[in-house]
Amino acid sequence: TDHAKKLEIEILEDEAKGITKTEKYFQVELKSGSCLEAKTVIYAAGASHRRLMIPGSKKLEGNGISYCVSCDGAFYQGKDAAVIGGGNTALDDALLLSEICRKVFLIHRRESFRGAYGTLKLLEKKKNVEIIRSTEVKKLEKRGREIQLFLDSGRELTVHGIFAAIGMQPRTEILKGLVNLDKNGYIQTEEEGLTSAEGFYGAGDVRAGKLRQVITAAADGAAAATAAARYILEHYQ
């Protein structure tokens, strides 16, 4: 932010609610009601965690349900926790929690996991980890400082915290019909972030098929900015 201010780049605290392409420019409609006209657009809105859609989960958000083990895992040292999910994040979360929690339940709705086989084998050897397959959580109830999980098998579990790792949702709803998206809603891009709409670039977690880390997002931004600047020089001089 400081770097942008030094370069006298205007920073708007607003939200884009729609983007359209005219013959020569992009029209960016803002939530405040104003509209911006741009020669190019770099779209880097990121992705958010998919929320649990279980009866009782909404009121437990931030009060027993977390989406970040590295942020909140330490609060459950010596306590019981549940991880819901079947990908790499779920397996990694369960492995990390197994080092600090008394008991970890890893719950997956399918029989097989999508995550790394090696991590799964490590979890299977952990005495304080119970892997529950082909099972869904039907309801959650807060009871004092504990949370009751009601499983579709009829079993009930009691934990102090729940970590959800059921995937990410890219913030690309406003791009439908403007650029090509994959089946999960991520932007399909070329090497420098160029999309199917000439002059429109994607960067960071909105891009399809890439490692989702801060360092790769920063690299995406640099590549897209360079490409966008070159596009303006080539088309508007």
Name each model-derived stretch:
Residues 4-30, 35-38, 99-191, 230-237:
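A Rossmann-like FAD-binding core segment of flavoenzymes
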Residues 38-39, 78, 159, 197:
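Active-site acidic short loop of glycosyltransferases
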Residues 48, 53, 58-75, 166-213, ...:
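FAD-site-proximal beta/loop scaffold in flavoenzymes
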Residues 64, 79-80, 103:
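Residues that mark the start of a beta-strand
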Residues 85-87:
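Glycine-rich Rossmann-fold phosphate-binding loop(s) that bind the pyrophosphate
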Residues 90-91:
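N-terminal Rossmann-fold NAD(P) dinucleotide-binding loop
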Residues 94-95:
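Generic hydrophobic/aromatic pocket-lining and core-packing "Φ" positions
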